[in-house]
A protein has these predicted regions:
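Structured catalytic-domain cores with a bias toward divalent-metal coordination
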Residues: 1-167
Length: 167
């Protein structure tokens, strides 16, 4: 599970914005269906089913969608057994890093959910300055081909309290 998308996205947008009008426009762009529904008092979630080269991914995605629909009571079926808390990983997106110059490069071909250790070299700025992980966590949405002054990657922290607040 990953939470914290909109706040982290908004922090990056605010940092890059030139004026209030641009900020408002770009923040509206970041508000998708889930955030809009929540803002109006509704219930919403985003179910990421992945898009990768795993040949089982279509079945995994179908099962995830059907399990969610059954669990929410939207279709008939047997409610899936809950995943024990100790078997799941919950993360909070906490910071987005920008590619500052076209010459900024990653240390290696990162993939979403790769683990990073505090102090680990993630990349190198065009001027040779190392880009180091400021804390241990996981990298999300690494974009090696990002343009200058746009999102380059996000970092997450573990969120051990996720889902336990009401249980």
């Amino acid at each position: 599970f990953v939470d914290g998308w909109l706040a982290t996205y908004g922090d990056g947008v605010q940092r890059r914005s030139r004026n209030a009008e641009e900020l408002e426009t770009v923040l509206r762009y970041g508000v998708g269906t889930t955030e809009y529904m929540r803002s109006t008092g509704g219930f919403a979630l985003t179910l990421e089913c992945g898009q990768h080269d795993d040949p089982t991914s279509p079945e995994v995605a179908y099962r995830a969608i059907m399990n969610t629909l059954v669990h929410l009571g939207l279709v008939a079926g047997e409610d899936p057994a809950p995943t024990p808390f100790d078997d799941m990983e919950a993360l909070s997106m906490v910071v987005v890093y920008d590619k500052l110059h076209e010459g900024d490069t990653f240390e290696r071909p990162w993939k979403s959910f790769d683990a990073v250790a505090e102090g680990e070299r993630i990349g190198t700025r065009a001027d040779g300055t190392p880009v180091l992980a400021e804390f241990s966590g996981r990298i999300l949405f690494p974009a090696a081909s990002a343009a200058a002054n746009t999102e380059w990657y996000y970092l997450t922290r573990p969120n051990p309290s996720f889902g336990r607040e009401h249980g």
